């Protein structure tokens, strides 16, 4: 009974919030907030799983309960019902819609009461399904639920490293056209079976998120790679050539690394010369990185190094490196579609681990602002150190810094801190102009962030600095939220 009591309290909060004109936060946020407020002992994951399902089916359950007259005969004590309407809703949900189709509690008066109505409840549920012309109620809510959790576009890029013999992409594109027969002019026009040719990134295409691609032979053989469009920005901005040597400082899972390789090797490489050094601190993530590199067909040309980039890579050891991609751990606030359970399993920021962690953006509603700012400050300090370390390499001429964060603390303000740093100025680094950073992309950096620091416009032009940065909004711009800036040396 303890679980249903706890879940009822949380459901009461959700119902109150839903009655407002504007709901503050998601279901995940509301569940976590209530669990914290009441100091509940029940597992928040379990509460969320039940309430998420119960809330979706609530209108149907209420109709069934009304028809079965279960709310009319509730026993009373001193004129008040003994059983809560919402607790009964939860029990009816588990009896009718849970996987086990049973109430998860021992002997209790409320359980006995609900089981008295078992037959009429089942009967009314069958009638409702017949009336709605469905076999299961899930048919009515599944499509909406899935669409809310999917990206607006599934982006795929052709991998020239697997396009034999000369990196020709046309045969792969011809195969894609067989599956996706309708070409659309805008990604927002995508429907199942259609394809969009991206205007910003070469060999990148958008398909409808419901279209299955992972079973396709092109995907299995590494000829196409699923990668969000914004995630393709760093390699495209860096645009390294055959003579460049690149370090990807935080490489896993490897999409940016292999995308970078496609610029150095526009066709399958004919030698085993290492041109990219990929660093990953976490050994398990490094295994994923190695697997992705192998699938992409560039294992001989990428050296995977397991360890902290700032400690393992020294300017003396890598004195010939010319280009860097620095995409360090960030708040992840630009990522959408992450399930509630991820918030319990993500890496936390540990005082002993400068690799940072991930802070789910949806938790901002109930994590104290002071705590969030502390986390962002720690992340931005780590990000600053990562980029500054890359800037210290003697042959470095170009660095792309990126995050999947929407917070200025991790984006424009890191750029500002670097520009104000004495060593960075002495090394001759500056923000690359707009013409070198996907100039046709419409959404640029926040000029107001630069105006706060460079008001005089003499040291740096705030407008030019903002235009040298790229931002992408979650979903609105066709994918994840993202930030990218390119530094180049005078």
Curated annotation (Swiss-Prot):
It comes from Saccharomyces cerevisiae (strain ATCC 204508 / S288c) (Baker's yeast). Its EC number is 2.1.1.311. It comes from the Eukaryota. Belongs to the class I-like SAM-binding methyltransferase superfamily. RsmB/NOP family. It is an enzyme of class 2 (transferase). This is 25S rRNA (cytosine(2278)-C(5))-methyltransferase. S-adenosyl-L-methionine-dependent methyltransferase that specifically methylates the C(5) position of cytosine 2278 (m5C2278) in 25S rRNA. Loss of m5C2278 in 25S rRNA results in anisomycin hypersensitivity. InterPro entries: MeTrfase_RsmB-F_NOP2_cat (IPR049560), MeTrfase_RsmB-F_NOP2_dom (IPR001678), NSUN5_RCM1_N (IPR048889), RCMT (IPR023267), SAM-dependent_MTases_sf (IPR029063). PANTHER family: 28S RRNA (CYTOSINE-C(5))-METHYLTRANSFERASE (PTHR22807:SF4), NOP2 YEAST -RELATED NOL1/NOP2/FMU SUN DOMAIN-CONTAINING (PTHR22807). Present with 922 molecules/cell in log phase SD medium. Disruption phenotype: Altered structural conformation of the ribosome in close proximity to cytosine 2278 (m5C2278) in 25S rRNA, leading to impaired translational fidelity, and promote recruitment of a distinct subset of oxidative stress-responsive mRNAs into polysomes. Interacts with TRM112. One of its GO terms (biological process) is rRNA base methylation. It catalyses: cytidine(2278) in 25S rRNA + S-adenosyl-L-methionine = 5-methylcytidine(2278) in 25S rRNA + S-adenosyl-L-homocysteine + H(+). Coiled coil: none annotated. The lineage of its organism: Eukaryota, Fungi, Dikarya, Ascomycota, Saccharomycotina. The gene is RCM1.
